[in-house]
């Protein structure tokens, strides 16, 4: 019900397997001649959710996009495991508030006892389901992993959350057996690579190992360990030494690279990191994407000319960013129609900054919005037409200008970049 797009895409990992258009009744049909058992996900923009498929399954999926996850129900052959997984997902989502507010302030032993009680309850329900319906070996393993790795994830988070909640200056001492669960961790199970609880755990686990290991052996205090280059090189080394599953390696390397690169470290550190990354993950399947990001960052360094991108004014004329910024100080910022609250906030912020910096022109670029909708929003929000521009090429702008933060801005003077990673809230 209430479709938000005209089609549904089925993925195995990151590869599309099949797609189907919705018919006049908002229904779709897929038939797979050959099927690899395992975890898939179906995507109906902008939402996605898991589905576990085995040979011979015949599933009907019902949902209302207004409450995508909450309304999702599976029926038919294969329904038992999939309904358990979606119920588990919803239950886990709702538990985080309880864990953070009620469990995290507790001492380590009490925290573990509370958390393990939740885990035991879920495993008990899974065992009952398995006894009644005899789940496949791989299906059972995946459901169990969904429970275990979410539990492990919270235990990895606990020392840092606890320090924050209690207001302690250093991490709390932990019992010797607190991390015993790590002996159960698999670094090379291909069936779990794209399972969110597993990946979320693995990413935080690597970061935790990097932090704790450096705290013991690098002769640095906790604040300095978070040095961008130092900490992230530790993460690269750990992924390289621990993780053997290729897809998992590639994805973890990619995530660490993106998180580091988008923090805009010094030019020297940036090049050191990239050299280390290429030495450890030179065949990464995401390499083109990572190299493109790194090149875009290089092109936004101080004193570099603005990239050759065109935008459209309200008269339908195309202008280059360089021409718009050719005289004096200009700050480019970004907004989009589908994010109305952000538009209100950023408009208010730009108004304040314009009064504070009358010698600077603040120029808005609208992304991910139709041309007609853009023009309507200009009037609705009282935006000056001469300082507002539009582009229909979101991908080029997002990638070339590295627009990954809602208050990302670019400060220029006479057509050259002063700060390619300015923040409207903190840089002015």
Mark where each language-model region is.
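Structural microenvironment flanking redox-active thiols in thiol-disulfide oxidoreductases
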Residues: 341-380, 395-397
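Extended amphipathic alpha-helical segments with heptad-repeat/coiled-coil character used for oligomerization
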Residues: 145, 149-215
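Short, internal strand/loop/helix patches
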Residues: 378-409, 413
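Long, charge-rich alpha-helical interaction segments
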Residues: 188-262, 272
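N-terminal "domain-start" segment that seeds a small globular fold
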Residues: 286-322
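A non-transmembrane, solvent-exposed segment enriched in polar/low-complexity residues
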Residues: 1-139
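Short active-site neighborhood of thiol/selenol oxidoreductases, capturing the structured segment around
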Residues: 317-350, 361-363
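Non-catalytic, surface beta->alpha helical segment in thiol-disulfide oxidoreductase systems
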Residues: 404-428
